[in-house]
């Protein structure tokens, strides 16, 4: 049966909704075996229409539990970048404004860490919840963070395995289907997806990010979801930290009032979301409301409520003990000049590689500079937090070459290039 579908695609045919339900049924029964891998390789080779992407997403949604709540829900997703904990800022920020927001976390592809990785740095934080628990949290705290694991979209986890094993992580149609099935299952009605492009992203080119955003717009609208697609560059990391616990600290600092790029981007995302929900709301008023809830502490208080409701240890957050590095070393500038580039791709790969082998959320890198900053010889460029001496020995050379100093100032780049609705 799967072989027949492969032949149909090879002949240029579009597959029906029934065909995609058959594919997903096979995925659930057989996992990521060679035959189903050949099918997805065929999709990669021969292409998919937007309608087919929607059909695959719908079939994967129906492979597991689908949430249905009688309430308007926001959700936010990122296609994956380095040093981007905006979701952790955005969830309590939106909730503090009286809106309801759900976040389905998932493990990330390739070199980035996902929201699931960051939240698990909070001791005892529970993301495997029943429908009743999810609804209760949405009604009491306006927010809920849930896992893509368990019985939510199990077919998508098979697709993840295939994409990683066979190098299909860059296929825009499969990426969209993977994202969309989870948003369909979460019950969200307004979804912001930050589509990233650049060296430190799965998607490398701006035009590919634009194409992906257009496919997302189609499948979301067909499912009755209001889409907000931001296209952003990974040239500059949003936050200063790279690593699970350190990115969590980054987000907490913003929720406690710190002014920085991470705050600017998070506030911009929040503005796009609440003005989509309320088209008559003036954007300047939206900015004022959102910034006020950071500065008056309501967003931070809401974060603690959300963590507490999901069993997380709020004391360790309040005492700033969530990030407990073992050893650290500073990398300094060898001359005066301007920060010309930061290779966050390599830095992200290093941190993830060590985290996966050590199973330690305290591994990380703190960037002390941004692109365009003027620095003097001897100033700290970044700090590397590690556990074993072998980690330092293995990566010192690679890390030391990740920040380039130039004689001329590089023009500051605001990362968000475009917004599509």
Which positions does each model-derived feature cover?
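Well-ordered secondary-structure scaffolds
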Residues: 4, 9, 14-16, 67, ...
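Acidic, glycine/proline-rich low-complexity segments that act as flexible tails and inter-domain linkers
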Residues: 1-83, 96, 121-122, 302-309, ...
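Alpha-helix C-terminal capping segments
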Residues: 45, 89-101, 182-187, 222-223, ...
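Phosphate/diphosphate-binding glycine-rich loops and adjacent basic-rich segments that engage nucleotide
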Residues: 139-189
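A glycine-rich helix N-cap at a beta->alpha junction
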Residues: 118-144, 214-220, 224
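General beta-strand structural signal in soluble alpha/beta enzymes
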Residues: 75, 101-105, 127-130, 145-148, ...
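Glycine/serine-rich anion-binding loops at beta->alpha junctions
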Residues: 72-95, 99-111
């Amino acid at each position: 049966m799967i072989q027949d579908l492969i032949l149909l695609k090879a002949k240029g045919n579009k597959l029906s909704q029934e065909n995609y339900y058959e594919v997903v049924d096979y995925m659930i029964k057989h996992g990521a075996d060679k035959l189903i891998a050949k099918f997805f390789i065929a999709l990669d080779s021969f292409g998919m229409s937007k309608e087919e992407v929607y059909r695959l997403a719908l079939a994967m949604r129906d492979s597991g539990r689908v949430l249905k709540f009688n309430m308007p829900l926001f959700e936010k997703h990122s296609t994956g970048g380095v040093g981007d904990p905006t979701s952790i800022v955005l969830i309590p920020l939106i909730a503090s404004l009286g809106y309801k927001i759900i976040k389905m976390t998932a493990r990330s592809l390739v070199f980035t860490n996902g929201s699931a990785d960051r939240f698990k740095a909070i001791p005892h934080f529970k993301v495997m919840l029943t429908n009743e628990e999810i609804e209760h949290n949405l009604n009491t705290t306006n927010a809920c963070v849930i896992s893509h694991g368990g019985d939510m979209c199990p077919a998508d986890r098979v697709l993840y395995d295939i994409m990683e094993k066979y190098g299909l992580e860059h296929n825009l149609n499969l990426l969209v289907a993977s994202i969309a099935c989870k948003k369909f299952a979460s019950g969200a009605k307004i979804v912001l997806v930050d589509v990233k492009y650049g060296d430190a992203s799965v998607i490398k080119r701006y035009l590919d990010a634009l194409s992906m955003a257009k496919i997302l717009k189609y499948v979301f609208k067909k499912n009755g979801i209001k889409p907000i697609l931001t296209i952003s560059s990974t040239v500059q990391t949003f936050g200063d930290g790279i690593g699970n616990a350190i990115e969590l600290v980054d987000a907490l600092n913003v929720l406690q009032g710190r002014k920085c790029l991470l705050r600017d981007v998070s506030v911009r995302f929040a503005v796009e979301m609440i003005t989509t929900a309320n088209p008559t709301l003036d954007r300047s008023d939206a900015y004022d409301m959102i910034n006020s809830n950071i500065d008056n502490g309501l967003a931070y208080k809401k974060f603690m409520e959300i963590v507490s409701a999901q069993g997380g240890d709020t004391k360790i957050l309040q005492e700033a003990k969530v990030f407990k590095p073992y050893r650290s070393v500073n990398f300094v500038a060898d001359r005066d000049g301007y920060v010309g580039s930061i290779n966050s791709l390599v830095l992200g790969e290093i941190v993830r590689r060590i985290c996966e082998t050590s199973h330690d959320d305290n591994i990380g890198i703190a960037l002390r500079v941004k692109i365009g900053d003027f620095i003097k010889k001897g100033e700290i460029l970044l700090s590397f937090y590690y556990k074993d001496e072998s980690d330092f020995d293995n990566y010192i050379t690679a890390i030391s070459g990740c920040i380039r100093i130039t004689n001329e100032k590089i023009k500051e780049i605001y990362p968000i290039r475009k917004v599509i609705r």
